Amino acid sequence: MRYADPSANRDLLGNRTLLFIFICAFALVTLLQQILYGRNYIKRYFEFYEGPFEYNSTRCLELRHEILEVKVLSMVKQSELFDRWKSLQMCKWAMNISEANQFKSTLSRCCNAPAFLFTTQKNTPLGTKLKYEVDTSGIYHINQEIFRMFPKDMPYYRSQFKKCAVVGNGGILKNSRCGREINSADFVFRCNLPPISEKYTMDVGVKTDVVTVNPSIITERFHKLEKWRRPFYRVLQVYENASVLLPAFYNTRNTDVSIRVKYVLDDFESPQAVYYFHPQYLVNVSRYWLSLGVRAKRISTGLILVTAALELCEEVHLFGFWAFPMNPSGLYITHHYYDNVKPRPGFHAMPSEIFNFLHLHSRGILRVHTGTCSCC
């Protein structure tokens, strides 16, 4: 019979106790470091909240820095970006005039919306051989008939409007109650004939000054306006006197159907103006955002309108711009506020566009609204 040394059991028990104490101490130190220094600043969510913090407070400077230090979207997990953005909502937003003016000066040099957003008789004279944006080998000869459709000059000038709202169609708008705030803007841009019926007005408003129309909508929903002219006209009437904006010279397929829009409105004696994006403006805007990391086959119409608004308006507010399946609180949302139809994969770079908007918000250049509104 072997003799069992009781001291060996005591040594083993002692070693286990020391190991357990070490693990607990390590866990406690790690937890304290996370609370005191961690990126999420857990104490923010539990301290007594007395309302929005001032824009230039130390807390808000730190929160904005947390967004701006993320140079590319792939640097952080999506949930981490959401946490940082959600924390920043504790801060009042204010326009940084020097940052905004510097950014607008850059846009003026590269793109110049007040002179080239639309084709006009001034920037596209009679006889011009106009190059398409995408079909660069294609040329459209500006004849007398088309020339008469163009306005003599741009109808808008630099910083003409004090406060503008650019309204995207994202599901983030659903239940936002932002309609009154959107309607309170001096000028409102909307994308691609979105529904603004009574069912949606509390969230998206009704005021519209410019609405874009993608020619693919005309082709698919209105049979290229070869027969369905009155239904198309009735849809446009919803936007009252809003100007209609089309990419007629994006590619050769867009031109005829875009020109038909002008004919339809003339036939029904509509007061609505019809404008066409200048293809060189679209090229310049795409190049500019490519330099900031937006790599896509085509930038979105929303991004084009935001770019133009930054030159035409003193203060720009974005609504309905969000490119993720969840809102900042982690709740799943539909792709659009009116349906859940997904976009063609790989065509736009929406997450990259939204990421740039969050940066511009943090720099005080524009304001991105992703929560509920409490206007007026």
Swiss-Prot record:
<dbReference type="InterPro" id="IPR038578">
    <property type="entry name" value="GT29-like_sf"/>
</dbReference>
<dbReference type="GO" id="GO:0006491">
    <property type="term" value="P:N-glycan processing"/>
</dbReference>
<keyword id="KW-0325">Glycoprotein</keyword>
<keyword id="KW-0333">Golgi apparatus</keyword>
<comment type="pathway">
    <text>Protein modification; protein glycosylation.</text>
</comment>
<keyword id="KW-0443">Lipid metabolism</keyword>
<dbReference type="GO" id="GO:0006688">
    <property type="term" value="P:glycosphingolipid biosynthetic process"/>
</dbReference>
<feature type="glycosylation site" description="N-linked (GlcNAc...) asparagine">
    <location>
        <position position="284"/>
    </location>
</feature>
<feature type="disulfide bond">
    <location>
        <begin position="164"/>
        <end position="313"/>
    </location>
</feature>
<keyword id="KW-0472">Membrane</keyword>
<dbReference type="GO" id="GO:0008373">
    <property type="term" value="F:sialyltransferase activity"/>
</dbReference>
<feature type="binding site">
    <location>
        <begin position="214"/>
        <end position="216"/>
    </location>
    <ligand>
        <name>substrate</name>
    </ligand>
</feature>
<feature type="disulfide bond">
    <location>
        <begin position="178"/>
        <end position="373"/>
    </location>
</feature>
<feature type="glycosylation site" description="N-linked (GlcNAc...) asparagine">
    <location>
        <position position="241"/>
    </location>
</feature>
<keyword id="KW-1015">Disulfide bond</keyword>
<dbReference type="InterPro" id="IPR012163">
    <property type="entry name" value="Sialyl_trans"/>
</dbReference>
<keyword id="KW-0812">Transmembrane</keyword>
<keyword id="KW-1133">Transmembrane helix</keyword>
<keyword id="KW-0328">Glycosyltransferase</keyword>
<dbReference type="GO" id="GO:0003828">
    <property type="term" value="F:alpha-N-acetylneuraminate alpha-2,8-sialyltransferase activity"/>
</dbReference>
<dbReference type="InterPro" id="IPR050943">
    <property type="entry name" value="Glycosyltr_29_Sialyltrsf"/>
</dbReference>
<feature type="binding site">
    <location>
        <position position="192"/>
    </location>
    <ligand>
        <name>substrate</name>
    </ligand>
</feature>
<keyword id="KW-0808">Transferase</keyword>
<keyword id="KW-0735">Signal-anchor</keyword>
<feature type="topological domain" description="Cytoplasmic">
    <location>
        <begin position="1"/>
        <end position="17"/>
    </location>
</feature>
<feature type="topological domain" description="Lumenal">
    <location>
        <begin position="39"/>
        <end position="376"/>
    </location>
</feature>
<dbReference type="GO" id="GO:0006486">
    <property type="term" value="P:protein glycosylation"/>
</dbReference>
<feature type="transmembrane region" description="Helical; Signal-anchor for type II membrane protein">
    <location>
        <begin position="18"/>
        <end position="38"/>
    </location>
</feature>
<dbReference type="InterPro" id="IPR001675">
    <property type="entry name" value="Glyco_trans_29"/>
</dbReference>
<dbReference type="GO" id="GO:0009311">
    <property type="term" value="P:oligosaccharide metabolic process"/>
</dbReference>
<comment type="similarity">
    <text>Belongs to the glycosyltransferase 29 family.</text>
</comment>
<dbReference type="GO" id="GO:0000139">
    <property type="term" value="C:Golgi membrane"/>
</dbReference>
<feature type="binding site">
    <location>
        <begin position="300"/>
        <end position="302"/>
    </location>
    <ligand>
        <name>substrate</name>
    </ligand>
</feature>
<dbReference type="Pfam" id="PF00777">
    <property type="entry name" value="Glyco_transf_29"/>
</dbReference>
<feature type="glycosylation site" description="N-linked (GlcNAc...) asparagine">
    <location>
        <position position="96"/>
    </location>
</feature>
<feature type="glycosylation site" description="N-linked (GlcNAc...) asparagine">
    <location>
        <position position="56"/>
    </location>
</feature>
<feature type="active site" description="Proton donor/acceptor">
    <location>
        <position position="348"/>
    </location>
</feature>
<protein>
    <recommendedName>
        <fullName>Alpha-2,8-sialyltransferase 8E</fullName>
        <ecNumber>2.4.99.-</ecNumber>
    </recommendedName>
</protein>
<comment type="function">
    <text>Involved in the synthesis of gangliosides GD1c, GT1a, GQ1b, GP1c and GT3 from GD1a, GT1b, GM1b and GD3 respectively.</text>
</comment>
